[in-house]
Amino acid sequence: MTIAVGRAPQRGWFDVLDDWLKRDRFVFVGWSGILLFPTAYLAIGGWLTGTTFVTSWYTHGIASSYLEGCNFLTAAVSTPADAMGHSLLLLWGPEAQGDFVRWCQLGGLWAFVALHGAFALIGFMLRQFEIARLVGIRPYNAIAFSGPIAVFVSVFLMYPLGQSSWFFAPSFGVAAIFRFLLFLQGFHNWTLNPFHMMGVAGILGGALLCAIHGATVENTLFEDGEQANTFKAFEPTQEEETYSMVTANRFWSQIFGIAFSNKRWLHFFMLFVPVMGLWTSSIGIIGLALNLRAYDFVSQEIRAAEDPEFETFYTKNILLNEGLRAWMAPADQPHENFVFPEEVLPRGNAL
């Protein structure tokens, strides 16, 4: 008689770590968490530190922290000085040489927040991929989240990489982002860019689709509860439908003459529209990084310059852009010591 004794399979450190990372807990960690949690913590902490204590006097010549009197809307972590170029501004690098105060003065916190923020967003997308795989569903949430990542990377990293330095990226603050939008309009005529138009159509179109879809579902809920509040009649595990797709189809068929008859196609469309808007606007920002122009109607500009009585909304916008450039550049880039002669300042077509 032969007795076979099985040997327990060898478990290496990788298997032990894999089990610990994927353990069922209140906040799932996962392999993506190794990237997500440290980078998100450092990015948020860097932003809170910068907006609370760090001045922008040495980079932009302005106050930008709560300590200097700013509020939540005007505080920001400002971009590094123009002279820093595209340096990563490492704390131990040749610029700061390990001096934390000097590092903050040069704008090192902005580079710190931007890079850690980008990796945190990527980690969050990978987290959605990882959990979708473990749960056994498709990864469309992660694919959709690539839209915000594309916008962040193109605006905060790709655009300044195409310009002379990190200085021209947006600073991390509410009013700072508004200033950046004015800059994009004045120097790139961004609102007339077709990629911006597609981005606006995607974002506002997505909001419209979301509102229409939510209202339609609420309109066609089945009266399947005895309570005054219809929300209490829903159970997450119920097998039957909670609203009538047929009734919704009849409603919109009467309104537009056409309506979605397939829930899968409807929800894919709701995914596609805003994500494509984010992607196309990101492509447009990369075009701005390369200083590509779009929709420059030079013939109208020439005619407006020659004929004081000829003016279009386009030529009026061009004059507004010239004003933005003329008055924004000296204030925004004081280190350049811009001086504009009186004759080049915009005064309107008739003068």
From Swiss-Prot:
GO terms for biological process: photosynthetic electron transport in photosystem II. Signal peptide: none annotated. It is a multi-pass membrane protein. One of its GO terms (molecular function) is electron transporter, transferring electrons within the cyclic electron transport pathway of photosynthesis activity. Keywords: Chlorophyll, Chromophore, Electron transport, Iron, Magnesium, Membrane, Metal-binding, Oxidoreductase, Photosynthesis, Photosystem II, Thylakoid, Transmembrane, Transmembrane helix, Transport. Fe cation binds at H213, H267. It is an enzyme of class 1 (oxidoreductase). This is Photosystem II D2 protein. It comes from Synechococcus sp. (strain WH7803). The lineage of its organism: Bacteria, Bacillati, Cyanobacteriota, Cyanophyceae, Synechococcales.
